[in-house]
Structures are given as C-alpha cells and as structure tokens.
C-alpha cells in the first residue's frame, strides 16, 4: 500500500542468515530438547511457566549473541555497496564491535546510542545526515521517531520477533527523497 501511495521508495529486501558455530548449534539443540521436555512435562507451551520461559529466553539470547553475526554483517556491508547505511544491532556491545571493525575497513561510521551524551549523539546524527559519515550504528535508539531519508541501506543485525519493530526499522530508509531511487534492507 505504501509503495502504491508513493510514500516509500522501491526497495529490495535481502534475507541473510549468519550461521552459528558448531558449539552454538549443539547448545541450540540442547536448549530445544530441554524446551520440548519442559513443555511435555507441563502439558504444553504455558508461557506462565517460569522454567520454560527461561529456557526459551536463554536460547534466544544465545542466538542473538552468535559469534558469526558481526563478521557476517561486515561482509554483507562490504558486498552490497550503498551511499549510506543504518546498522541496527542487538545491543550496545555489538554496535561498538561492529563500528570498530568497519572503521578499520575505511568506512566513516559512528555510534548512536544512550551511552553517548546528547551533544555527541546529535553531532553523530548531523554528520550522518550531512554525508560526513556513511554508516550510523545503533541498537534500539533509532527504532521509533526518527526519519533517516538520507540512508539508502539498512542492516538489521538483531533478531526481533516484533513485527512492529521490524517495520519501524525498515521505515528508517524507505522514505522518499529527491536523490534516492531505491533502498536495500538486509
């Protein structure tokens, strides 16, 4: 509907998966078996059951912190050339790690999150909007309330299951601007 109403640009949505390490795969399988056993014991997926909830939470956290996620994201950034990227990570630690790696690879990037004071956040945002930076890395600080029409690429390195959050994040780069023909969302 939004594309037909001409409020967003044409875009390509690329689904990519960072494979887990063998150790992570094994842990994932163990968590899954434990979840299945617990669900069978309590007679189903009762999300009010604290042990079941914790097993599911810990499995999801392990996936979110997979060792290959950041290197894979860097590889995708290098492979898919765009004028400017917004990279949304799972947490501040991942944002810092991703930013450090891509700066070493020659990208002009900065972090935008609540660890920075307001002046530094504003400076990083303005530098991105002006084109002085070509990558802005954040976790949840850019989820809602920010328009970033300058960006023509978005990389979502977090594994949110919230449809609303995914739509909000994609919307950061889909706004129409005079110089943008299309956008890429990874």
Question: Which residues are covered by each model-predicted region?
Answer:
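Interdomain helical connector at the RecA1-RecA2 junction of SF1/SF2 helicase-like NTPases
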Residues: 1-82
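Conserved RecA-like ASCE P-loop NTPase motor core of nucleic-acid helicases/translocases
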Residues: 84-91, 112
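Conserved RecA-like P-loop NTPase helicase motor core
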Residues: 103, 108-186
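Short phosphate-engaging motifs
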Residues: 24, 69, 94, 162-165
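Pre-Walker A (Motif I) flank of P-loop NTPase domains
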Residues: 81-84, 133-134
């Amino acid at each position: 509907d939004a594309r037909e109403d001409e409020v967003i640009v044409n875009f390509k949505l690329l689904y990519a998966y960072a494979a887990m390490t063998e150790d992570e795969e094994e842990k994932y399988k163990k968590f899954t078996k434990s979840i299945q056993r617990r669900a069978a014991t309590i007679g189903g997926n009762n999300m009010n059951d604290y042990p079941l909830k914790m097993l599911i939470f810990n499995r999801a956290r392990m996936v979110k912190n997979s060792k290959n996620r950041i290197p894979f994201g860097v590889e995708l950034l290098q492979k898919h050339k765009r004028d400017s990227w917004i990279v949304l990570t799972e947490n501040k630690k991942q944002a810092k790690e991703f930013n450090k790696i891509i700066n070493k690879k020659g990208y002009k990037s900065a972090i935008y999150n609540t660890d920075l004071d307001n002046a530094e956040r504003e400076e990083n945002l303005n530098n991105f909007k002006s084109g002085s930076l070509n990558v802005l890395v954040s976790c949840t600080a850019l989820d809602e309330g920010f328009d970033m029409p300058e960006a023509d690429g978005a990389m979502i390195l977090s594994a949110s299951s919230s449809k609303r959050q995914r739509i909000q994040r994609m919307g950061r780069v889909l706004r129409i601007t005079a110089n943008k023909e299309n956008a890429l969302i990874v």
